[in-house]
């Protein structure tokens, strides 16, 4: 897959002019679709019969075996499609197919939390070609999705506002095309690492943008430039809410050695895909995990990932942060303005969710050189020990750090403190924490106190003050 990405960016496509198709209208290779610095290659989308877009319906009633539906009332009525439910389309990207495991896995995760029509859009006939051609074919894919949405509205009185399109890579821009063709009436579009080549910094008509739906949210996971870093995703903000997990460039767990990635737990094919495009694929894996972890992907408003990593963007500005992924639409300020940027950290493997806490420690006892660690205990769970500070430990000094826990502890009940000496000290000094303050991402503060001190490697439990 990696080789196809690289080669197809540099191979010429055949110039066309304009082509028209029944039902879908006309397509042009004039500017801005081609002949620009961002899209230098001329080319037209293929005939719909060649792309062969198929709609594969999964529902709570048929979670394991899809039903193929078309823009035909009798076909839809004989299926398990329900007009009183939301409909979520999933559109794959370059080289992929609608029957790939991750699309069905996303549907099955949805069925755990809601009753929904989940439609996997298969366009392998147009995705398994040169990238330059596939980037044109997504216009037809988007047009086909829009045609079905318009059909559902006109024939079954099904509102576009109940539609959510989830697109990965090129599928994000196909979703944008569907949104443009339905005049922004679609309820929501989620872009999962929208493809960069031929789309970044193009006019809005060409790519995904906030006007394509009532709400557009985007997850960026592979934003390095395609040349020379082989980053496949956009760094440009293109939604109402744009999330940059781990900075949006390099994802934890994507730097394993070649053998460990190819011999993946999910099989050789999935491992090979991860080796070729691990960062790019993380976007849909984060989304899938977010479905069953509604509070585990809080994004923090910040100027940059550097500021976020420097602990300058905590807690949530209004007491509530948007959740990256499935529940992004629950954020009250989701459409107050375009291009709102949010940052967060994730784990290096599933479950990717993390909960961020600020821990401030006021030291007591003797002056030594060492490092201190704190663990949290709450009514929902406990964390491991996290290092808060390393250096000169002076009584009365306050040190703070922010941690990303793989456990949501809930309401805190106690904390435990431990310290380690960096050098051998025969005087057996004692150090403690007179106060430890823990702040959750929602701004709630928990204070814990102790008058005790302990020797190195001895746990000290602090209770609420």
Swiss-Prot record:
Keywords recorded for this protein, A-Z: Calcium, Disulfide bond, Glycoprotein, Hydrolase, Lipid degradation, Lipid metabolism, Metal-binding, Secreted, Signal
Annotated positions binding Ca(2+): 204, 207, 209, 212
Reaction(s) the record says it catalyses: a triacylglycerol + H2O = a diacylglycerol + a fatty acid + H(+); 1,2,3-tributanoylglycerol + H2O = dibutanoylglycerol + butanoate + H(+); 1,2,3-tri-(9Z-octadecenoyl)-glycerol + H2O = di-(9Z)-octadecenoylglycerol + (9Z)-octadecenoate + H(+); all-trans-retinyl hexadecanoate + H2O = all-trans-retinol + hexadecanoate + H(+)
Active site, renumbered: 169 (nucleophile), 193 (charge relay system), 280 (charge relay system)
InterPro entries referenced in this protein's UniProt entry, alphabetically: AB_hydrolase_fold (IPR029058), Lipase (IPR013818), Lipase_LIPH (IPR016272), Lipase_N (IPR033906), Lipase_panc (IPR002331), PLAT/LH2_dom (IPR001024), PLAT/LH2_dom_sf (IPR036392), TAG_lipase (IPR000734)
Record has ATP-binding as a keyword: no
A single BP term in Gene Ontology: lipid catabolic process
Subcellular location: Secreted
SMART domains named in the record: LH2 (SM00308)
Glycosylation sites (chain numbering): 351, 398, 425
Cysteine pairs bridged by disulfides in the record: 20-26, 107-118, 254-278, 302-313, 316-321, 449-465
Any single GO CC term annotated in Swiss-Prot or TrEMBL for this entry: extracellular space
Origin: domain of life: Eukaryota
Regulation: Inhibited by bile salts, is reactivated by (pro)colipase/CLPS.
GO molecular function, one term: triacylglycerol lipase activity
EC number: 3.1.1.3
The PLAT domain, residue ranges: 355-465
Family: Belongs to the AB hydrolase superfamily. Lipase family.
Function summary: Plays an important role in fat metabolism. It preferentially splits the esters of long-chain fatty acids at positions 1 and 3, producing mainly 2-monoacylglycerol and free fatty acids, and shows considerably higher activity against insoluble emulsified substrates than against soluble ones.
Subunit structure: Forms a 1:1 stoichiometric complex with (pro)colipase/CLPS.
Record's protein name: Pancreatic triacylglycerol lipase
